[in-house]
Regions:
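C-terminal cap of metal-dependent C-N hydrolases
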Residues: 44, 404-410, 415-416, 483-529
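Divalent-metal coordination cores built from histidine and acidic residues
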Residues: 83-100, 104-192, 211-218, 277, ...
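Active-site neighborhoods of metal-dependent hydrolases
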Residues: 148-150, 158-169, 173-197, 211, ...
Length: 538
């Protein structure tokens, strides 16, 4: 090849490269630009969760974060624009206490999401917990975010079974090791259900020792009080004592006072919690907006009667002297735990007779030819317990107490609900309606809270309590957990006689920037995350 041909080829090569670069530049200019936002909510009334006054603004989401909040944000370039004019745009709601036993099989958690809930805290205090927890967290996919605790009931059952005694030194060391394992695997703290067997057999020394393990990790102590009826004040003092000994923040789940004999005690209970705060303790509580609670029939029996399981109970009942003692104690206990009449106990789940679901103990007495009296009710409860017991709805709370708890400064909201399948079983209506009920009944109808204050209790307050800084408010850079609802239409529809009814007024729910519910339908998306501790190590 001569020199001329080499030079000519080189020039042609340069021209080719120049032309190629030009074509790339032109094609790049013509290609669609990356979306400015993945989702733009326009024209809504923003309540940001901080307690600040509402304002009209657009909310832009990019990825799993809030990208911008402001008036008339640019629509052009947004992948999707949703007009939410006339709707409230708030942070997603936090359910501070619920039961998610079947989450692995029902990750949509539909009855929670349809309430506007984007984060659920599962204490695991009354059921077996997933173990190892880290493997469970890696495997399970769900629509809402979820926070898990080290459940004391499961831990005690694993180590001691149903024994009614204090642990040996070796048993306590084993339980402490199980708490430590759960904390290293992401638990948010220790939870107890001290009203239930076998947790009720644990004394304050045991509970405080286990809480001490969670404290250095930045964990908290959450509890279903040992007693929510006549001994509720002692139960509150015990909870505060655990907090003092373990140097750990304490949270009372579903703060309430049950039993007609104790109605009105909410004032003294709140005064006790306030005095602890004034003394420097970190104390919180959560509430659900119903005057009936739901739990096992075990609650109607003194703990000693149920120790060591069903065979031991049957043996005690067969002994005339022991049975007489039991009957006498239960006659006193009945109005302390439920209402004054047999009709105050409603069956939810009876394993040996599904037809009883929704009926009351009074209905059962009539159907079996017995008088509707306290004496007959106690005998019926014993007979039912011998056949396996039941899960019930106990109408034993006062509306004034519920409102006083709910509106007290610093109180948060919860459902205490179960993960339910629509149309199946007979759940407490709280599983479908707790959060809409607060906004409809206590905000719109009774005006006991402002909308801003209610939203703050449902969003920013629980996030701040747990030290989770990137959730709970609407602000640039926060995780995009968002609930859009109509303040004038939101309402619970579930009732004690017809529980399977969806609430109304929720338009859209997004979790980590992904829409999981919109216009009456679940999208099927499962973007939820397991929460990690936000509080620093102590």
């Amino acid at each position: 090849m001569n020199r001329l041909s080499v030079v000519g080829t080189s020039r042609r090569g340069r021209r080719g490269r120049t032309l190629a670069a030009l074509l790339i530049a032109v094609s790049s200019a013509c290609a669609p630009a990356a979306p400015t936002y993945d989702l733009l909510l326009t024209g809504g009334t923003v309540i940001d969760g901080t307690g600040a006054a509402r304002r009209v603004a657009d909310v832009a989401i990019r990825g799993d974060r809030i990208a911008d909040i402001g008036a008339s944000l640019p629509r052009r370039g947004a992948a999707r624009v949703v007009d939410v004019s006339g709707q409230i745009v708030s942070p997603g709601f936090w359910d501070n206490h619920a039961h998610l036993v079947t989450l692995a099989d029902h990750g949509l958690a539909e009855n929670f999401v349809r309430q506007g809930i984007t984060t659920v805290l599962a204490p695991l205090h009354s059921q077996d917990q997933p173990f190892p927890m880290d493997q469970y967290r890696a495997r399970v996919k769900m629509a809402p975010n979820v926070g898990l605790f080290a459940g004391h009931t499961w831990i005690r059952k694993r180590v001691m079974g149903l024994a009614d005694r204090a642990p040996t030194a070796a048993e306590l060391a084993w339980m402490r090791a199980l708490v430590d394992s759960a904390m290293t695997q992401g638990a948010l703290g220790l939870s107890t259900g001290l009203e239930y067997v076998p947790a009720t057999y644990a004394k304050v020394d045991e509970v405080a020792s286990l809480a001490e393990v969670a404290s250095p990790y930045g964990g908290i102590y959450v509890t279903h009080l040992r007693d929510e009826g006549p001994a509720v004040m002692d139960a509150l003092r015990e909870t505060l004592e655990v907090g003092r000994r373990a140097r750990i923040p304490v949270q009372v789940n579903h703060l309430k006072v049950t039993g007609a004999a104790q109605w009105g005690w909410s004032t003294r209970m709140l005064a006790l919690l306030d005095s602890a705060r004034a003394a420097g303790m970190e104390v919180a509580a959560d509430v659900y907006p119903y005057t009936a609670y739901s739990t096992y029939s075990d609650l109607m029996f003194p703990p000693w009667a149920l120790a060591d399981g069903a065979p031991a109970f049957a043996k005690r009942v067969a002994d005339p002297a022991t049975r007489a003692r039991l009957v006498q104690e239960m006659r006193v206990r009945f109005p302390q735990q439920a209402g004054a009449e047999p009709s105050s106990i409603q069956f939810r789940e009876v394993s040996f007779d599904a037809s009883l679901a929704g009926k009351t103990l009074a209905d059962y007495l009539v159907a079996t030819g017995q008088p509707v009296t306290l004496e007959a009710a106690v005998e019926a409860l014993i007979a039912l317990q011998l056949r396996g017991g039941f899960i019930g709805i106990f109408h034993g709370m006062d509306e004034a107490d519920v409102a006083r708890f709910l509106t007290h400064p610093g109180t948060m909201v919860e459902t205490d609900g179960d993960l339910v399948t629509f149309g199946r079983g007979f759940p407490h209506p709280r599983s479908y309606g707790s959060f809409p009920r607060v906004l409809a009944h206590h905000v719109r109808e009774r005006q006991q809270l402002t909308l801003e204050a209610a939203v703050q209790r449902m969003t920013a307050l629980p996030a701040q309590w747990l030290g989770i800084r990137d959730r709970g408010t609407l602000a640039v850079g926060q995780r995009a957990d968002i609930t859009v609802f109509n303040a004038g239409q939101i309402a619970d529809r579930a009732t004690y006689t017809a529980p399977h009814q969806w609430p109304e007024g929720i338009q859209l729910v997004a979790v980590n920037g992904t829409v999981v519910f919109e216009n009456g339908r679940m999208t099927g998306a499962l973007p939820g995350m397991f929460l990690t501790r936000g509080r620093g190590a102590r």
